Every structure is written in structure tokens, then in C-alpha cells.
């Protein structure tokens, strides 16, 4: 084995020289230089500095402006709330531990941080699944003129949290475990060992199939069918130009969110899968640390995409920041500026573009 396994940790370094110590008790500066840990702490501080105000303002503006509280926006806000949750409960811990060079909060703190990080990431993934299914049903119309209403949105939100908990909670109850990963400053599911005492192998397989592969298959299927339908409708002029534009704009926003999610999380999933399928292979701590910390940036881009691509939300945000007045004269979002996201909550003939 090219790593050192303890009762509640796995350090990716052989202990032949006797320098390996528990990542809960000692700085891990034999894994990387102190400046590298400082760089991780600075990176997490930057994510917190950006993530807290962006996610908070997105939630606050939506609560303040009633017209933004549409059914589809419930799912988008659920995603933003999950990101805010990750920043508050996960990023702050990781920044502090990186400053010290080891996971200073002990095994219990590792379980808590790992749980919150996994929960937030899974809520984001399943929210994108719900958005993909909603786009497929509304645009492709496999269920005729289905209306995505408030009850459907609430059920969708509940579904995302149930699925996320079914992934994040088992390690808390003895199926697998959370351990420090990479440079030992943040915690995640144990991909490093088989650990038969906690049936770790079966959990990792379950996680990759149910909570990564299946969601991606659903997302790709929905958007594959959606793109075909949009092209057919445009060619046959089955929908009005305003309807087509509104549906395309909503779809574009969600597709961009999916693409960025994949950019952030696929490298982490690939590295984790490689480590799991190559037990005991030789890899450095940075090999897992870089994709793990890069994946954390996903908490920033979703609200940014939402703000940039949703004209009505931008108008409401400007109105809020300017104390109720929009200096650009589009204060309340005129009737011509109906939200793109409302396209999914009304019938096609009622949709107007943003």
C-alpha cells in the first residue's frame, strides 16, 4: 500500500519513514509546503467572500419581489439555497482547517463537514435533474399541455432533499464513512479504502450509480430530446416566435448551469473513481485536492448565471440595490419584460419574452 490507513483516516503517503501523523492532531506539512495550505485557505476565503453576498442577495431579492416567486424559480432558489448552505457550513470550516494545515476539528467535525459538503452538492445535482425534467415536459409536451404549478415545484424541492439525504446521511449511520481527503483539510466520502467494517465498497458503488450516473443520464436524455423538439418546432413554425424565444432563453440558462456543474464536478468524480478502482496505487495529495477544491466553486456560478441571464431578476436586483428605484427606467419589469422563467408555469400561448 502506498498510503497510511488509520482508524478514521487515510493519508496518501507511505509511513516507511515514520513521518505520517493523524490529520486530526498534527499539521500535514510533510504532504505539501505550508504555502500551499495558505493558498488553499486564501482560495476558500475568496469563495466565501463571493459566495455569501451573491447567494444571499439572490435569495433576498426573490423574497422581496413577489413576481419572482414563480414555480420554476422555486427550484432555482433551492439550488441557490443549497449553495449558500455549503458556503456557510462547509467553506468556513475548510478555510479554517487549511490555515492550520490539518483538520483541527477532529473526526466528529470531519463527519459534519463531509455531510454538509455532500448534501449541498447533491441538492444542486438533483435540482438540475428536476429542472431538466421540467424543461422536457414543458417544451417536448409528452404529457400534452402540462402546467408546472406551485405544488409540482414544492414536490420537486422535496425530492431533491430526499435524494440528497439518501446520499449524504448513510455514512453518519455506519454505511461508509467521512474522512479527510487530499491534503487532509477537507472531508468527503472514503474513496480510498474498501473498509469492509462499514461496507464501504457497496456504498461507493451505490453512490456512483444512483447519485451520479443516473442523474447524468436523465439530464442528457431530457436535453437531447429538448434540442430535437426545439429544432422541429422552429422548422415547422408550430409555436409563435415569442413563445419559442421565451422557451429557448429558459432552456439556455438551465443548460449553461448543467455545463458548469459538469465542468466543476466531473474532474472530482473521475479522480475519486480512479482512486477507488486503483486501491493502493501511488498518487500525491494534490491529485485529489485540486479537483475537490475546484468543485467547491460550483457554489458561486449558479446565482451568477441566474443574474446574468434573467432580465427580470436583474431589474429587481437593481431596484433593491437602489432603494426601490431603478435608474435605468425598467424598475418593475414592464409587461414586455416578463421573466423568462415564467415560460414554464403558463401555457405556451401565454408566454412573453424577457
UniProtKB/Swiss-Prot annotation:
Keywords: Cell projection, Chromophore, Disulfide bond, G-protein coupled receptor, Glycoprotein, Lipoprotein, Membrane, Palmitate, Phosphoprotein, Photoreceptor protein, Receptor, Retinal protein, Sensory transduction, Transducer, Transmembrane, Transmembrane helix, Vision. The modification N6-(retinylidene)lysine is found at residue 296. The keyword Methyltransferase does not apply. GO terms for cellular component: membrane; photoreceptor disc membrane; photoreceptor outer segment; plasma membrane. Residues 334-354 have a biased composition (Low complexity). It comes from the Eukaryota. A lipid is attached at residues 322-323 (S-palmitoyl cysteine). The chain crosses the membrane at residues 37-61, 74-96, 111-133, 153-173, 203-224, 253-274, 287-308. Photoreceptor required for image-forming vision at low light intensity. Required for photoreceptor cell viability after birth. Light-induced isomerization of 11-cis to all-trans retinal triggers a conformational change that activates signaling via G-proteins. Subsequent receptor phosphorylation mediates displacement of the bound G-protein alpha subunit by arrestin and terminates signaling. The record marks 113 as: Plays an important role in the conformation switch to the active conformation. Contains one covalently linked retinal chromophore. Upon light absorption, the covalently bound 11-cis-retinal is converted to all-trans-retinal. After hydrolysis of the Schiff base and release of the covalently bound all-trans-retinal, active rhodopsin is regenerated by binding of a fresh molecule of 11-cis-retinal. GO terms for biological process: absorption of visible light; cellular response to light stimulus; G protein-coupled opsin signaling pathway; G protein-coupled receptor signaling pathway; phototransduction; visual perception. Gene3D superfamilies: Rhodopsin 7-helix transmembrane proteins. InterPro entries: GPCR_opsins, GPCR_Rhodpsn, GPCR_Rhodpsn_7TM, Opsin, Retinal_BS, Rhodopsin, Rhodopsin_N. It is a multi-pass membrane protein. Disulfide bonds join 110-187. Glycans are attached at residues 2, 15. This is Rhodopsin. A motif ('Ionic lock' involved in activated form stabilization) lies at residues 134-136. Residues 331-354 are annotated as: Disordered. Pfam families: 7tm_1, Rhodopsin_N. The keyword Plastid does not apply. Its main location: membrane. Residues 62-73, 134-152, 225-252, 309-354 are cytoplasmic. It is found in: Membrane; Cell projection, Cilium, Photoreceptor outer segment. Residues 1-36, 97-110, 174-202, 275-286 are extracellular.
